[in-house]
Amino acid sequence: MGIFDKIFGKKKQTSDVNIFDKLYPYQKEAVASAIANDKGIVCMPTGTGKTYIQSAIIADDIIKNGDFQIYVVNAPRIVLTYQLLKEVYGFLAEAKIEARYMFVHSGGKMNEKELEDIRIKANLDGANIPFSEIGSGTNIAEIREMIGKAKKQNLPLIFFSTYHSAERIEDARVGFKPISIVLNDEAHYLVQEQFHDILHTLKSNRCYFFTATTISTPSDTGRGMNNKESYGDVLYVMTPREAIDLGKMVRPRLHFVITDGVYNTDDYNNSLNKIIKDTFEQHERILTKTLPKVLVSAKGTQDIKNFLKSIECRQLMRDGVSIYAVASNGEIGNNINGEQVSREEFLRRLKTDGLDVTRKLIVLHYDILAEGIDVSGFSGIMPLRTLSKSKFLQTYGRSARPDAEDRRKVDNGEINVDDLELMNKPYAYIMIPSVYSGNDDDKANVVQLITELRDYGFNPNEDIVGTDRIHGISEEEQLESLNELKRNLPNIGETIENLQVVLEAEKHAKLSKSELLKNQFGI
């Protein structure tokens, strides 16, 4: 008997599909850690397959216990619940597991065509999953009715809820069996006061928290994820560097962009449209094997509205660039090339264009696409505002997904993760327009950014690109990029150089005497 047979135990129901065969070894470890504990945190970078882990946890419990069980998958945003349901549905269908599903939020139903395609394919592969309508609503009576139907059919029921609406499930559940498992996606949101109470109101036998970055508070009895009573222990951690070494993320590079005549905040406000266009075009020039697909984090919805009405936007569209914009603002909504579309249509076309190697994209958002949305193909991000640590890591994660062909070749052993010159997408770029005035806040923002990127193996001497540099340059030329930055943006360049000195000193301070001699003098 293998180790995972021991961990996952004897199954109540049998299937000719091993649900764990499709998981990577690190995902199996995370699932095993969750199964061995009733509560805890799984912390892994964006793009490493946390939803697969959630799906496997649910599938394992269904196979072991079968029959009528209640599961809840929570997320901070409505749009993310749609993506989560699709992935969980696909995983369970492939495992030949029939279940009932319901959304608990105000966003309405999703287009079920994609789910039908998944169901039909699973049935062609030997499953026997009948069509069933996906429920949706926040009315307690409707939720309770769905629970009753699942119980009568003796089928597992999986709710996909926003944090805002999750307590309605507990209200509707009264009189039925307890919730078996609660899975909280983007769980760092639960630190916020408006959501934290559901940790206590939504009762379950088992509860897990998934995030790319944990948030702690000064007190280990407060709302932070360092409160073990609320969140349990950290069950599994994968660092960004580990994800890169496994080929599940790409390396970051900073691209400081020089835009003529734009150097301070006032100029920024007057020249935003030019900044976006020039930055995009300079980014395109440094790419050698892929076309640019850039995610822009706007300062506010007004910036997005102004850009969509600008000459620069029209010029980019004439040049073949598709312009996507999304915000909760009704005037923006879900916008593709100036046309309002449904949320589902927006996400469907965005995913399709993200995979299309012949497409150029600019996607502007304000606080919408940062969390967990499955859009691949971004070549870089353009943060036009200072992001919190969690927001930055989530936003960068949107562009850090490897190219599909690169991932396949790494998985098959055709190339390794250090064969950067053989990859279509060896790096994800963080584009910094030259709107810094060199004041203390600007310097602090750059220092904070580089400090966060250290977890990704970022080296300021090697991973900064100037306007006329391309990826794949030699080490000597990489160093010249920092010198170029010092010439064009002296305040920022000197700040980075000084930070590098501090980082090197910190690194050396951690070395033993023998390690230091070897590192410094080769002896």
What are these regions (language model features)?
Residues H188-M249:
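Post-DEXD/H (motif II) to motif III coupling segment of the RecA-like Helicase ATP-binding lobe
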Residues A243-V250, E405-N498, E504-H508, K513:
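A conserved SF2-helicase RecA2
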Residues F8-C43:
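Conserved pre-motif I regulatory segment
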Residues N37-I58:
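Walker A/P-loop
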Residues Y52-A56, D61, D67-L92, K96, ...:
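Conserved Walker A/P-loop ATP-binding site and its immediately adjacent core
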Residues G330-N461:
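Conserved RecA-like P-loop NTPase helicase motor core
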Residues I140-P178, Q192-D197, I368:
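Conserved helix/coil segment N-terminal to the catalytic DExD/H
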Residues G232-K305, S310:
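Conserved interdomain linker/interface between the two RecA-like ATPase lobes of SF2 helicase motors
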